[in-house]
Structure formats: structure tokens, C-alpha cells
Swiss-Prot record:
Purpose of the protein: Transport of potassium into the cell. Likely operates as a K(+):H(+) symporter.
Similarity comment text for this entry: Belongs to the HAK/KUP transporter (TC 2.A.72) family.
Transmembrane portions of the chain: 61-81, 107-127, 143-163, 173-193, 211-231, 255-275, 287-307, 345-365, 371-391, 402-422, 427-447
GO molecular function per UniProt: potassium ion transmembrane transporter activity; symporter activity
Membrane-related topology note: Multi-pass membrane protein
Organism for this UniProt entry: Sinorhizobium medicae (strain WSM419)
Name used for this protein in its record: Probable potassium transport system protein Kup 3
Keyword line: Cell inner membrane, Cell membrane, Ion transport, Membrane, Plasmid, Potassium, Potassium transport, Symport, Transmembrane, Transmembrane helix, Transport
Catalysis: reaction(s): K(+)(in) + H(+)(in) = K(+)(out) + H(+)(out)
Length: 633
């Protein structure tokens, strides 16, 4: 597996590489937003009912779609937020890590904002596969109405297969994601062009006054429709989250050259079709195609939705890994499915949770029409969070005056709040789902942070300063522990205090190794730490050294590999004659200790679900010694 230098944020050094990154970004970054035409315009028309939508309403709706894509995706994400990176990496937690590193006047507010944004993204990762796959497979009802009852079972089978192959990695098939999605966008654009001629009046949708006029005249229905309009930009947050994988210029080029034109043409074509054939309101996307093309389009749409689903699943894995490394969640098992790309990971527990959530949503709602209202809340919430974090970023990182930041971001923030309000109208129609998912994840992250903090406070009362301990054991005395040959490495989170496992080893075994290394592992608030900055070794005495290993929150925290690097550069020890001492705590709940009983039990359950440090840090299992203790929390 390559080191972190091989996984720096993507940059194109020549034209072929730039084109490869651009096509790749079309598949991974834009897969989600590319499937929105399947259902977004249909859902926007739904409040008017069959035959209840007039020409002005159709043109106004398409105008709203075009200008929402322009304001939210083009201006906010493609032109602005892609520049707000943390050493080339984007995403909510990456931006939060940068703000916490730089310092902010509102650390608690920023923490909760970042965690809420991440939690909403996990909700999105459950809803996107369910909604997009259902939307694609529902096209079968137009091919053969008798297949109506088979839509849900077929969709469930596709989802089961999709999650079943996650453990094998997607490296082998991901090379096809970009080309397949490129074909999808080109077909959508061609379909749009073919139908714009049905009624050229649709071209007046480019005039933003039509969007404003629609909202002014439609009243409450217009406000409710905004929730469906926002479905056209679902997946825009992936632009920012995938910044490190493809680079800003490739993502921007893909948007302006392919994605935006294809989406605009397709929505214009759907609008023209509805103007000329009002009965097409039931499913304007698939009704753009002749009967002979319906089955191929269902197959292509299904492939596109699988790619979109894969993108958010991969994004969820990456986000949870960031949360683990930043200390927001316990250490879950992380499997690397590629020998060359640390970004290709698989988290078994997270995969199971996502699969369970997706299947539950599909079985609970049964159709894309019923599930669509649940989608907008998570996306609008995540985008509002991005804007809040971006406001603090431009002030701290770019040095913008407060008035300048307000002038630039307030219009976007206000627009997103309006969309959020429109989506909140759908809470009783399924909008509660992402709120419940986000609330559960926030509760877990907050409980973990509080529990870890309380645990540190309790153990700190028994801590022995490391310098004091070394002075004591180095002193010649008849009670001094027996020295044994070899090297012992003791893992600790607090390098200035004596590891509890070291104290227990002396207390119970009465021995001290010839060489003792106090090792601490730090996660920097940057995505990757260069190998030259990976470690620092400090000699404390003849028998004691302090080793600090540093990893970025996107790095594979492979301690064995880092130690090999240390050995090459002068840190002398034999890995197979070295013992790694780890402490294992048995947590006992006590409602009087600082946490409510329910939170105590949740924290202990989360701690018990964490992967063994031996596996997580890639330590040689046959060289690990564990000593346990009970802690009341």
C-alpha cells in the first residue's frame, strides 16, 4: 500500500490526465445530480394535479430549475466553495477541522454545525440509493404496465447486490463510471434538444422574471413547490466532498462543459413536452423517449442510479473515517480494498447500517413518489451548514471583513433558508426521516465526545507524571524492577503522563524492558501528513524514549509501516523482538458519575463496538500484550 504522498489531492499535470480526471468526476461527483431529472420536475408538477398546470406555471417552474442550478451549484459550489479547501480536501468535516485548527470564536457552534452537516449527509447516503434506484426501475411500468408489482422487488435486489459487492471494492468497475455517466448526460441532452422544438416558448425560461413571477402568483403552492425544485440540485454537496479526489479545475470543467448544459437542455425538453402534451405530467422524463427506447433507457437510468448510489456510499465511508480520526466516533473496522488507493475503503459496520436503512426506506415508502419529500430536508440542511462554515472560513482563512462575507454569502444563505422552509412543510410526508437519522448520529457523536472527555478526567486523577516515573525507576534501588532484554512500546493518548499499562506491567510483573518507548498517535487537522513529518523521537533517559506519530484524518493509520520508516532513519529496534503493550478498559456504568444512565449505556455500547487497536493500527498481533482494568463511568 502506498504512503500518504501518493494520495495527495488530485492535480492534473498534462492534458490527458486532466481529461481523465474530468471524465472521472462526471461519474463520481455528478452521478447524484445527474439522476435528478428522473423525478425532480415530475415532483415539482405534482402539486398542480393532472390538467391543473398552465403554460405560465410550466415555464415558471423550468425557470426556477435553471436559476436554482445557477445560484446554488454554479455560483456557490463550483465557483466559490471549491476554493475553500483544507490542503486540497473538501467536505463538511474537512472544513470543520480547518476551522478548529485555525481557531474560531464559536468552537462549540462550529462543532455542532459541522457534526449536523455530516449527520445529514449520512441521511442522504440512505435516501439517495432508495430514491434513485426506485425512480429508474419505475420506468418499467411504461415498458410493460404488468411489471408494476415487480418494481419494488427488483429495486430491493439491486440494492442488495450493490451493498454486497462493497467489500470487494469498486476499483475494477469504477473506471467505467465516468464513461457510462457521460453517455447518460449526452442522452439526456439529446432528448432535451429533440423536444425543445415541441414548444419554443419554453426558451423564455431563461428569463429569471418568469421564476419570480411564478412564485409571486402561485402563493402557497409556489412555496411548497420550492421543496421539489430543490431536488434538482441534490448531489451538489458532493462537488465539495469529492474535491480532493479530482481537483477543482477538473470538477469545474466537467460542470461547465457537460453537466450543466445537459441538465438545462433536459429540463427545457421536459418543460416543452408538458406544454405540448399536458398528459406527460405523470412521468415527463421517460415520456420524452419513443416506446422502442424505453427499455434501453430504463437500463441506462438504472446504471446511472447505481453509480450515483455508489458515490454517496463511498462518500459515507470516507466521512465516517474522517469522524473516527477526528475523535467524533469510536474506531470502527476499516478495510482497504485497493493496494494503491487509500481512498477505496470499506467499513463493514457502516455498510450494514446503510443497507438496513436503505431497505427500510424502500419498504416503508414503496415508491419514489412517496419517498421524494424525505430527500430535500437532508440536502437543504447540509447546504445551509456548508454556508455557515464557509462564512467562518472566509473570515479566518481568507481574512475577509465581516461585511464583505455577509454581502457575498447572505443572499445564498437566505435563498437556502427559503428552500429549507419549503422542505420543512414535508416533515409529515417523510421529511422527518433525515431529521431522525441526523439526530441519532449527532446524539452518538456528542455522547462519544462527552464519554471520552469524562473517561480522561477520571483516569487523570490516577495519572503519574512521566518525568517523575522515569526518575523513580531509573534510581538504583533494591526495589527497582528487574530489567529484561528487548524493546517495549506502550501506547498512550497523553504522552506527558505514564501509560496505565506500563504501571500495571511493573505492578504485576515487576519487570522493565531494556528499551521502553512511550508512543502516542496524533491525528492532525489536515487530510494528509507528509512522510518527512510523520514522527518525532525524543530521548528521555537511557531506557526511555518518546515517539510521536502523526497522521492526517484521511491517512491510513498504519503504525507498523510508520515504525519501519522510523527504523530506516535511525530508530533502532527489531520489530519481531518488540512487545506492544496496550491497555484494555472494562467500563462500568454509574449514573452518579457525570452522564445520564442512558448515555452511560450508549457510550459503553459504542466503546464495545470499537475495533481492537491491534487491528486498527496494524500492529503485529503476535507481539501485542494487553493488560486490563475496570473504570466506573
Amino acid at each position: 500500500m502506498a504512503d500518504s504522498l501518493d494520495h495527495a489531492p488530485a492535480q492534473a499535470n498534462n492534458l490527458p490526465q486532466f481529461l481523465a480526471l474530468t471524465i472521472g468526476s462526471i461519474g463520481v461527483v455528478y452521478g447524484d445530480i445527474g439522476t435528478s431529472p428522473l423525478y425532480a420536475f415530475r415532483e415539482a408538477l405534482r402539486p398542480f394535479g393532472p390538467g391543473g398546470v398552465g403554460r405560465d406555471e410550466v415555464i415558471g417552474l423550468v425557470s426556477l430549475v435553471l436559476w436554482t442550478l445557477t445560484a446554488i451549484v454554479t455560483i456557490k459550489y463550483v465557483l466559490f466553495l471549491l476554493r475553500a479547501d483544507n490542503d486540497g480536501e473538501g467536505g463538511t468535516l474537512s472544513l470543520l477541522a480547518l476551522l478548529l485548527k485555525k481557531g474560531t470564536k464559536y468552537p462549540v457552534l462550529m462543532f455542532f454545525a459541522g457534526v449536523l452537516g455530516a449527520a445529514l449527509f449520512i441521511g442522504d447516503a440512505m435516501i439517495t440509493p432508495a430514491l434513485s434506484v426506485l425512480s429508474a426501475v419505475e420506468g418499467l411500468k411504461l415498458v410493460a404496465p404488468a411489471l408494476h408489482d415487480y418494481v419494488l422487488p427488483i429495486s430491493v435486489v439491486i440494492i442488495l447486490l450493490l451493498f454486497a459487492v462493497q467489500s470487494r471494492g469498486t476499483g475494477a468497475v469504477s473506471v467505467f463510471f465516468g464513461p457510462i455517466t457521460l453517455v447518460w448526460f449526452l442522452v439526456m441532452a439529446a432528448a432535451g434538444v429533440a423536444h425543445i422544438g415541441d414548444d419554443l416558448a419554453i426558451l423564455s425560461a431563461f428569463n429569471p422574471l418568469n421564476a419570480i413571477g411564478f412564485l409571486w402568483n402561485a402563493g402557497l403552492i409556489g412555496f411548497i413547490v420550492l421543496g421539489a425544485i430543490f431536488l434538482t440540485v441534490t448531489g451538489a454537496e458532493a462537488l465539495y466532498a469529492d474535491l480532493g479526489h479530482f481537483g477543482r479545475h477538473s470538477i469545474q470543467a466537467a460542470w461547465f462543459a457537460v453537466v450543466f448544459p445537459a441538465l438545462a437542455l433536459n429540463y427545457l425538453g421536459q418543460g416543452a413536452l408538458v406544454l405540448s402534451h399536458p398528459d406527460a405530467i405523470s412521468n415527463p422524463f421517460f415520456l420524452m423517449f419513443p416506446n422502442w427506447a424505453l427499455l434501453p433507457m430504463v437500463i441506462l437510468a438504472t446504471a446511472g442510479t447505481i453509480i450515483a448510489s455508489q458515490s454517496v456510499i463511498t462518500g459515507a465511508f470516507s466521512l465516517i473515517r474522517q469522524a473516527i480520526h477526528l475523535g467524533f466516533l469510536p474506531r470502527f473496522e476499516i478495510c482497504y480494498t485497493s493496494e494503491t488507493q487509500t481512498g477505496q475503503i470499506y467499513l463493514p459496520l457502516v455498510n450494514t447500517i446503510l443497507l438496513t436503512g436503505v431497505l427500510a426506506l424502500m419498504l416503508m415508502f414503496g415508491s419514489s413518489e412517496a419517498l421524494a419529500p424525505a430527500y430535500g430536508v437532508s440536502i437543504t440542511g447540509a447546504m445551509v451548514i456548508d454556508t455557515i462554515l464557509a462564512f467562518e472560513f472566509v473570515r479566518r482563512q481568507w481574512g475577509w471583513p465581516a461585511l464583505t462575507a455577509i454581502a457575498v454569502l447572505l443572499p445564498l444563505f437566505s435563498l437556502e433558508l427559503i428552500f429549507l422552509g419549503a422542505n420543512l412543510f414535508k416533515i409529515h410526508h417523510g421529511g422527518y426521516v433525515p431529521i431522525l437519522i441526523a439526530g441519532t448520529l449527532i446524539m452518538m457523536m456528542w455522547t462519544w465526545r462527552k464519554g471520552v472527555s469524562l473517561l480522561r478526567e477520571k483516569t487523570a486523577r490516577q495519572d503519574v507524571p512521566l518525568d517523575q516515573f522515569i526518575a523513580t525507576v531509573e534510581r538504583k534501588s533494591e526495589h527497582a524492577p528487574v530489567e529484561v532484554p528487548g524493546t517495549a512500546i506502550f501506547l498512550t493518548a497523553t504522552p506527558d503522563t505514564t501509560p496505565a499499562v506500563l504501571l500495571h506491567n511493573i505492578k504485576h510483573n515487576h519487570v522493565l524492558h531494556q528499551h521502553n518507548v512511550i508512543m502516542t498517535i496524533k491525528t492532525a487537522k489536515v487530510p494528509y501528513v507528509p512522510e518527512k513529518d510523520r514522527y518525532t523521537i525524543t530521548k528521555l533517559s537511557d531506557r526511555f524514549s518518546l515517539l510521536e506519530l502523526r497522521f492526517g484524518f484521511m491517512d491510513d493509520q498504519n503504525v507498523s509501516r510508520a515504525l519501519v520508516r522510523c527504523r530506516k532513519e535511525g530508530f533502532r529496534f527489531e520489530i519481531m523482538s518488540t512487545s506492544f503493550y496496550l491497555g484494555r478498559r472494562k467500563l462500568i456504568a454509574d449514573p452518579r458519575s457525570g452522564l445520564p444512565q442512558w448515555q452511560d449505556k450508549l457510550f459503553i455500547a459504542m466503546a464495545d463496538s470499537a475495533i481492537d487497536p491491534t487491528e486498527y493500527f496494524h500492529l503485529p498481533a503476535n507481539r501485542v500484550v494487553e493488560l486490563g482494568e475496570q473504570v466506573i463511568i
